Amino acid sequence: MIKLIVGLGNPGAEYTATRHNAGFWLVDQLAREAGATLRDERRFHGFYAKARLHGEEVHLLEPQTYMNRSGQSVVALASFFKILPDQILVAHDELDLPPGTVKLKLGGGSGGHNGLKDISAHLSSQQYWRLRIGIGHPRDLIPEGARAGAKPDVANFVLKPPRREEQDVIDASIERALAVMPMVVKGELDRATMQLHRN
């Protein structure tokens, strides 16, 4: 059963619309659906709400520590409420999936994502669930003939807003993720994964 849903992103209005904040977009939607208000909670270093989602009580968290220190926020809340790693779902932007794709996964490496890296270090575990929201990779924007030897600027890419057509399909993928949340919060993660990956 998932007891904590974390959205990853960077704090501040200048980052709100950037690709790196896709995790925040999902948690914002969940809070809206539940009629919950995310409030600044200093002891958890983030915006926090306790919400009732599909009949289950769930903690929602958006760390306000900047991406590479997200673990500080997650471990503060998880320790306080005695939540185990496999009861945590972290929603984050995923470079290795094209825009419009969303996947659920338990455990694994960070794939170069600094937020995941820090969470794994603070939890001393990689065995938490991830909701991977595809944003594409900057190499995909380089014409095929010019890709050899090209060094895509990943840092710049994730800190820019998606193009209009990308935003539309990312929004649609978040809607698909929201549709499986009743299963997620009840602990039916395998069923949720199958449904999500079928689309």
Curated annotation (Swiss-Prot):
Looking at the UniProt record, the site noted as Stabilizes the basic form of H active site to accept a proton sits at 93
Question: What general EC class does the enzyme of this chain belong to?
Answer: hydrolase
Going by the UniProt record, its keywords in alphabetical order are:
Cytoplasm, Hydrolase, RNA-binding, tRNA-binding
Q: What domain of life is recorded for the organism?
A: Bacteria
Name of this chain's protein: Peptidyl-tRNA hydrolase
Q: What gene, per UniProt, encodes this protein?
A: pth
Drop me one GO molecular function for this one: tRNA binding
Instruction: List where in the cell it is found.
Output: Cytoplasm
> Reaction catalysed by this chain?
an N-acyl-L-alpha-aminoacyl-tRNA + H2O = an N-acyl-L-amino acid + a tRNA + H(+)
**Active-site annotation:** 20 (proton acceptor)
- Name the job this protein performs: Hydrolyzes ribosome-free peptidyl-tRNAs (with 1 or more amino acids incorporated), which drop off the ribosome during protein synthesis, or as a result of ribosome stalling. Catalyzes the release of premature peptidyl moieties from peptidyl-tRNA molecules trapped in stalled 50S ribosomal subunits, and thus maintains levels of free tRNAs and 50S ribosomes.
Matches recorded under InterPro entries: Pept_tRNA_hydro, Pept_tRNA_hydro_CS, Pept_tRNA_hydro_sf
Subunit and partners: Monomer.
Write down the position(s) of the site called Discriminates between blocked and unblocked aminoacyl-tRNA: 10
Q: Which GO terms describe its biological process?
A: protein quality control for misfolded or incompletely synthesized proteins; rescue of stalled ribosome
Question: Which Enzyme Commission number(s) are on file for it?
Answer: 3.1.1.29
The entry sums up its family as follows:
Belongs to the PTH family.
> What Pfam families does UniProt report for this protein, alphabetically?
Pept_tRNA_hydro
Q: Which residues bind tRNA?
A: 15, 66, 68, 114
GO CC list: cytoplasm
Q: Which organism is it from?
A: Burkholderia ambifaria (strain MC40-6)
